[in-house]
């Protein structure tokens, strides 16, 4: 009984460590993963993503077929990052702190 309890605790700690270590640190820039490539310059020049960064996803089921996506800037959502996410409480908190500091 004691051994199974210890095994459960160890498993829980390992999962917690993995989850916490995979979370980005504030201000940290993540590298593109193995299935993401930079977008062609033409798409970046045409502002494919309104408020974000364009990435070319490599589809494993259809290699060679281009699929582009956006990694949105903070507080923006949508297919091309064109919508301000007003449901994010951080948007209002960030706005209040900048307003208060300018007074």
From Swiss-Prot:
Disulfide cross-links: 39-54, 49-70, 72-81
EGF-like domain ranges (all copies): 43-82
Domain of life: Eukaryota
Secretion signal span: 1-30
GO molecular function annotation: toxin activity
GO CC annotation terms, alphabetical: extracellular region
UniProt keywords, alphabetically: Disulfide bond, EGF-like domain, Neurotoxin, Secreted, Signal, Toxin
Location(s), subcellular: Secreted
Expression by tissue: Expressed by the venom gland.
SUPFAM superfamilies membership: EGF/Laminin
Function (record text): Ant peptide with probable defensive activity which acts as a potent agonist of the mammalian epidermal growth factor receptor (EGFR). Mimics, both structurally and functionally, vertebrate epidermal growth factor (EGF) peptide hormones. In vivo, intraplantar injection in mice causes long-lasting (several days) hypersensitivity of the injected paw to both mechanical and thermal stimuli. Its long-lasting effect is unusual for venom toxins whose effects are usually immediate.
Family in the record: Belongs to the EGF domain peptide family.
This protein's name: OMEGA-ectatommitoxin(02)-Rm1d
Organism field: Rhytidoponera metallica (Australian green-headed ant)
């Amino acid at each position: 009984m004691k051994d199974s309890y210890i095994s459960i605790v160890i498993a829980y700690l390992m999962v917690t460590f993995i989850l916490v270590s995979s979370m980005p640190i504030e201000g940290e820039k993540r590298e593109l993963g193995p299935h993401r490539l930079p977008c062609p310059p033409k798409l970046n020049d045409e502002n494919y993503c309104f408020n974000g960064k364009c990435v070319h996803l490599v589809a494993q089921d259809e290699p060679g077929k281009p699929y582009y996506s956006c990694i949105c800037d903070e507080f923006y959502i949508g297919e091309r990052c064109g919508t301000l996410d007003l449901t994010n409480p951080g948007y209002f908190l960030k706005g209040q702190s900048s307003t208060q500091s300018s007074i």
